[in-house]
């Protein structure tokens, strides 16, 4: 092999190692990848209109259709960019996955936004989680009360995202099966 061939091979290998694949594969796009996500601007606009009218929005679609990517790279950046003009651009997004303990997981997701929560000793964090979980379970307005307490004194909008919402149905079936046994 000549020196020229080696040089070309080294150049090609170095070029390949610097290539960046803009597609995340099967995982959803993250907020930091918004610049790679495009083509659903019309859907983002429609979602913002529906959210501003009803304060609730369900994003439905088949598994793998891009619901999470749409949320993280379409809707959330639009909200933070002030596209829902009456609400402003000051938003915090609390993301929770139901898993096997939906209320407890939601409480944990909410507490991430409580000032100084992470500085508390483990025992005090557990007490806080128990209190928030109890308030969430206490009434249909439990979530509203918890968010008011977390945001006390702040002028901030809160978007609560329940990602993988369908897990709630699996959880309720599992809970029903366990109570039958």
Name the predicted role of every residue range:
Residues 1-181:
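Amphipathic helix/helix-loop-helix segment enriched in hydrophobic residues with interspersed Lys/Arg
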């Amino acid at each position: 092999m000549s020196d020229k061939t080696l040089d070309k091979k080294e150049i090609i290998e170095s070029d390949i190692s610097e290539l960046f694949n803009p597609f995340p594969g099967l995982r959803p796009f993250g907020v930091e990848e918004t610049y790679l996500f495009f083509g659903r601007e019309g859907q983002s606009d429609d979602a913002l209109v529906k959210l501003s009218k009803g304060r609730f929005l369900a994003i439905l679609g088949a598994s793998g259709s891009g619901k999470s990517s749409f949320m993280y790279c379409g809707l959330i950046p639009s909200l933070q960019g002030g596209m829902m003009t009456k609400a402003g651009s000051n938003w915090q997004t609390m993301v929770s996955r139901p898993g096997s303990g939906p209320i407890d997981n939601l409480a944990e997701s909410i507490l991430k936004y409580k000032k100084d929560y992470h500085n508390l000793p483990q025992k005090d964090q557990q007490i806080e989680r128990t209190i928030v979980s109890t308030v969430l379970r206490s009434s249909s307005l439990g979530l509203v009360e918890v968010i008011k307490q977390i945001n006390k004194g702040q002028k901030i909008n809160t978007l609560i995202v329940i990602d993988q919402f369908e897990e709630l149905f699996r959880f309720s079936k599992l809970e029903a099966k366990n109570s039958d046994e």
